[in-house]
Amino acid sequence: MLRDARTFTVDDPRFSTAKVVGPSMLSLDGARHARHRAPFTRPFRADEIHARLEAFTQAEAGRLVSAIQPSGAGELRRAVAGPLAVTVMAEALGLGQTDPAQVLSWYDGIVAAVQAEAANAGATSANAGATSAGAAAFAELSASLRQVIAAPPPSSLLADVTGALTADEAISNAGVLLFGGIETTEGMIANAMLHLLSSPGELELVLADPALIPAAIEESLRLEPAAAVVDRYATSDTQLGGARIRAGDQVTVSIAGANRDPRIFDDPDEFQIRRPNASRHLAFAHGPHFCLGAHLARLEARIAVATLLDLLSELRLDERYPATPRGLVFRKPTDLRVRWSTAIS
């Protein structure tokens, strides 16, 4: 289904993100989708991501974790996972000189507006207010991005886009990248740490051999994808799994469900970092809308997990505050409270 964009499309007036940021690679299919996505393909390749952003991400992760190290306790989503996702995406888009709090404010406004549109913006005054605030946030972000497009810094992934897309098109796609790059990467890091700290045996394997961290991240993505569902819209009458679907029907795909398909994964509800086929997960979707930022998200998660385990000795969950992933669409723990040793050996 995710491969068949002709029958199940994202290009539909009900697509809430497009109402906020305009048409982008996320909300288009076919030739229009290809034209919007193509200029971003090279800068988002693994080698480009590593060359442009690995050193920055490593330094930023070290700074964030070192800042909390003396305290012996903390909440990792807000102290590390979220701030790292914000600063890396700001750097990636050429907004590295912008206050991260400002970038987060724009992001929060856009997210609230997308959620309001999805819930029918006119239904309540609160939704209408969120839509208005989101439009203002996107306008401010757009103004900053226009300056970047006019003179992109070398690290900006927008440097290769200039000329291939109009300024408005580049900005719409940058807005989508900001939205996805913060929300899902924050969840990806938080979920990976929750899974490791909840599984002492698997954690011991990683501590003994840090080369297993990428495998742990893939297994975490399988068990709890940060984006659990995606929507598609039927373009014609069809059948799917024995169900009759009419043209115009909205079809919600459960990525989380597919990732626990017992026909594909043995013991699918267990966290096993040595699972041989964990990478067959669909956490980054599939087909023409496979996540463009997958390499960047993996880089951030790998560095974040490695830095946390390296700098925070005897890292463990704070049992006074149970944590579990929450959310229908985007899933992550609301709080991830942990403790660690501050003793100097």
Residue ranges, per PLM feature:
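Cytochrome P450
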Residues: 1-345
